[in-house]
Amino acid sequence: NKYCNIKCSKVAHTVCQTGESTKPSSKNCAKVSITSVGVTEEEKKLIVDEHNRFRQKVAQGLETRGNPGPQPAASDMNNLVWNDELAYIAQVWASQCQFFVHDKCRNTAQYQVGQNIAYSASTAAYPGVVKLIVLWENEVKDFNYNTGITKENFAKVGHYTQVVWAKTKEVGCGSIKYIEKGMKSHYLVCNYGPAGNVLGAQIYEIK
């Protein structure tokens, strides 16, 4: 497939490694009971709207949390749009059931691609996509804009910084919902183009 021509520092592309199917991996997914694969049209809209709502909140200087807060306003925040190719690659990876592991090569011909992963489970109902994105947003509480992202703080704030990375233009996500130990579980993989979280770069320009 065409993704076998896209290389990332000597690692084969996810879609080259796994094949082009978005069906759950029979080997890895056997340990859970999968109930749905993929994002609905409604979920796509919710994902884009929630990213842009939060990006605008930060851009307008309305995010009071931080270490220290508030976060400075931004002058260069792009509005995100959905990208089906990013979503497809994210879905191929989500369907591998390699929970909480980032794939090594997810780029497209157009973009270096970043990634956020989230998981939540409940006995009552499957947690929605907005709830999962809010988990990423909440990392702002540990973020110091002046320090930016470093190897030291990346694990604590890296999801937040990708959500609000100003130069990112497009997002696409894959999802699987499954039952594990009686819990209704939702696993979300979002891919971003162009990628954020470039060490040493500013997450956005201050207004």
Curated annotation (Swiss-Prot):
Keyword Oxidoreductase listed: no
Gene Ontology CC terms, in alphabetical order: extracellular region
Which domain of life, per UniProt? Eukaryota
Keyword hit for Cell division: no
CDD domains assigned to the protein according to its UniProt record, in alphabetical order = CAP_euk (cd05380)
State the disulfide connectivity.
Answer: 4-16, 8-105, 29-97, 173-190
Alphabetically list the UniProt keywords. Allergen, Disulfide bond, Glycation, Glycoprotein, Phosphoprotein, Secreted
Q: Which residues carry this modification: Phosphotyrosine?
A: 111
Tissue specificity remark: Expressed by the venom gland.
Q: Which residues are glycosylated?
A: 141
Q: Which Gene3D superfamilies match?
A: CAP (3.40.33.10)
Locate the SCP domain: which residues? 49-192
Can you summarize the PTM annotation of this record? Glycosylated.
Q: Return the similarity comment.
A: Belongs to the CRISP family. Venom allergen 5-like subfamily.
Q: What else is noted?
A: On the 2D-gel the determined pI of this protein is: 9.7, its MW is: 26.5 kDa.
Protein name, please? Venom allergen 5
**Organism source for this protein?**
Polybia paulista
- Taxonomic classification: Eukaryota, Metazoa, Ecdysozoa, Arthropoda, Hexapoda
